[in-house]
Amino acid sequence: MYPVDLHMHTVASTHAYSTLHDYIAEAKLKNIKLFAITDHGPDMADAPHYWHFMNMRVWPRLVDGVGILRGIEANIKNLDGDIDCTGPMLDAVDLLIAGFHEPVFPPQDKAANTQAMIATMAQGNVHIISHPGNPKYPVDIPAIAQAAAKYNVALELNNSSFAHSRKGSEANCRAIAAAVRDAGGWLALGSDSHIAYALGIFEHCERIIAEVNFPQERILNVSPRRLLDYLEQRGRPVIPELAEL
């Protein structure tokens, strides 16, 4: 069990079913020490309004010993790597995930998908690329792993890709984990929970990690401190309320 979950959605993304309060309660049951709420960026049809992300400053940082990060799963929009988290929104979030979603960036060929993903990393704002193993978006796996290491961006192993969505992702996810291992990059684990009961469930990710002998020291979820150190190293401000996690 990893004590950090970096990808989940609330009822603010209306195809999800749990609230922030639900996730806090579930985290306490599962001994999850830190999680990031990452609702969809505003270019998705059922995403929260811009104001939702700007007003996350009202959230407490720590509730009953559980740390809460303010995040977003932004959408990669084009071949230039532009995303729908810009301007003041960049300062409103602690954790910025970005990925491909069909309503915003329809699947293209391997060269175009690879170009867009690497361009997104090169812009310097994104911390994690979400579900890069989606078979609908073929990419040059060694190239994206090398770019992720170069730009200090984590590639995600998404547990939901093995269970509920993006069928056929497993072979790509295994290859991505191995390529990130060889490139010396970071892996991030995300439950991609759309209901609180799935918080912190990484069983499929853990199997892939074991199969490719991925080093634990390159997984962001190993401890709250590792994730917070990474974000600070990437230029995010220190969060004093979470210093003791």
Swiss-Prot record:
Keywords: Hydrolase, Metal-binding, Zinc. One of its GO terms (molecular function) is zinc ion binding. Its cofactor is Zn(2+). Zn(2+) 1 binds at H7, H9, E73, D192. Zn(2+) 2 binds at H15, H40, H194. One of its GO terms (biological process) is bacterial-type flagellum-dependent swarming motility. It comes from the Bacteria. SUPFAM superfamilies: PHP domain-like. It is an enzyme of class 3 (hydrolase). GO terms for cellular component: cytosol. Its EC number is 3.1.3.-. Belongs to the PHP family. This is Probable phosphatase YpAngola_A2446. It comes from Yersinia pestis bv. Antiqua (strain Angola).
